[in-house]
């Protein structure tokens, strides 16, 4: 993917060829690699089509103002063992820019699969196609947004310059077409995608046989390890694919893997090693009888292998007993032909022995058309004629049975589908196809979805029910019950291997470390990705009270991929004086704060009281009055008396 968002990834893989070749030559002595790139269809709305963008679609983009014109797919280097040519070709590449988020990656994958001569696929080699991107793909019918209504024809359209010429003429390929062409050319597709798109491409692997998906780092630094892991996974797995299966045939698979256990409904085995044997039993069932002398052919092929088994199917729908016919047989009351134990009545006659004539009144025998006394004739779903039921026709299906008590449409449904589409309805009960159980046949007995990358079922901490792990080990959880912090599992057993290489741990020398880690592949990192769905997170306390963390992923080869922190996470040792000063300072600050709050409250209270006093004083109105206790210094008294010293009376005042 050479869209603009992959610029940092391109910088990372410029010297990929040398390192990849070194690692792959540890696995195979005959290794070749090639290179191609894609962006998207060069039409609107997928790309910038205005004239100003024709030579530089990044014009006006401040972060990266210069890039090459957009293109669909370019095959840049045929498969070769010259690693320097690969590195040189990668160094020449520059990114481009498309308009929408999805990429035209499936156009590129299909051309890489069908252009065998130009790519250089060898007939007897194992074919790996590594597809890297950081976004979602365009799929079939998306091309209609750009006016492309012609479906993809699945053919090679590379010109002399090895450029895809039908990019702006045909729609994107469908997943079915992609899977067909990959299988037809024995190509194993590896989706190397960023974590936020992992689940989308994981779902694609269920629709495209022979594909695997791996999580790509944001800058593609792990691309080599990713390819090695996918290669080991492919080499340790065998899966059967079916080609040209007739519609009227049901195929039922039973796989017997390296453990010798048979798995009904499973068509693949994983975790295989050199010398292991896997066998498959295939049962063929005819759902209907085609016309006479019809012969069908289908093929069984291991995914990614060119060998196949072609199976020819002939149908035998005639019974041997039909040779001896007895016309007008006494067993049929002389009015019918006895064939294969049954009577075929002449026109106008009815009954199991042709004993009745059409139109006769046989109401006296109608009780023979009831299952039990009191029930409706023919269960209310048929007419009673000549002591037997003739069942009505129904738009929903077939009504049948001696008393019309059965049908093939009244069984349990799942999401609106009768018997979940995995069984046949017989008289109100689902008869499940091989590989399915349950009242409505919604429960698959296929345990491949519960098998981890290490070949274990539910990590041996649970059982597989309906294709999903039900964890029984206390504390276990995860899609494969692979996570269990409280279990005495690999976290404790792998701890010695993790501790041994650490210089400060006091563990034994390198020879001992080699012995402890003989089944481990250790990668040292500065930070641990804690939300990795594929990995199990482990941590423990060291002697220095630090926390050491690591993750592990079980590989199909039986080894484990350990990702370990370079240094344990340690907190700073607290200083006693610092703690003392902090405590004393805190107490003083709290005391001062309380005093300040108290002073503030008292001041507020006093101000309120003084304001209240001032308010009452301003409202007071007093009347003028004298003090009853006050006496003036001068007083006047009036006295009435009679003075008769001289025999005179006198009235007056005395001061």
Swiss-Prot record:
> How does the protein's chain sit in the membrane according to the entry?
Single-pass type I membrane protein
Q: Does the keyword Lyase apply?
A: no
Q: Which Pfam families match?
A: EGF_integrin, I-EGF_1, Integrin_b_cyt, Integrin_B_tail, Integrin_beta
Q: Residue ranges of the VWFA domain?
A: 1-234
Its GO biological process annotations read: cell adhesion mediated by integrin; cell migration; cell-cell adhesion; cell-matrix adhesion; integrin-mediated signaling pathway; stress fiber assembly; transforming growth factor beta receptor signaling pathway
Tell me which residues bear Phosphoserine.
Answer: 626
Q: Which GO terms describe its cellular component?
A: cell surface; focal adhesion; integrin complex
**Positions of glycan attachment:** 203, 316, 408, 442, 510, 561
Q: What Gene3D superfamilies does the annotation carry?
A: 4.10.1240.30, Cytochrome c1, transmembrane anchor, C-terminal, Laminin, ntegrin, alpha v. Chain A, domain 3, von Willebrand factor, type A domain
PROSITE patterns to which the protein is assigned, alphabetical: EGF_1, EGF_2, I_EGF_1, I_EGF_2
The chain positions of domain I-EGF read 321-355, 356-405, 406-442, 443-482
| MF (Gene Ontology) | integrin binding; metal ion binding
Disulphides: 58-67, 115-156, 257-269, 289-317, 321-340, 332-343, 345-354, 356-386, 369-384, 378-389, 391-404, 406-427, 411-425, 419-430, 432-441, 443-466, 450-464, 458-469, 471-481, 484-487, 491-538, 497-517, 500-513, 546-570
Q: What ranges does the Extracellular topological domain annotation cover?
A: 1-575
Matching PANTHER family: INTEGRIN BETA SUBUNIT, INTEGRIN BETA-5
The protein, known as = Integrin beta-5
Q: Name the lineage.
A: Eukaryota, Metazoa, Chordata, Craniata, Vertebrata
State the gene name recorded for this protein: ITGB5
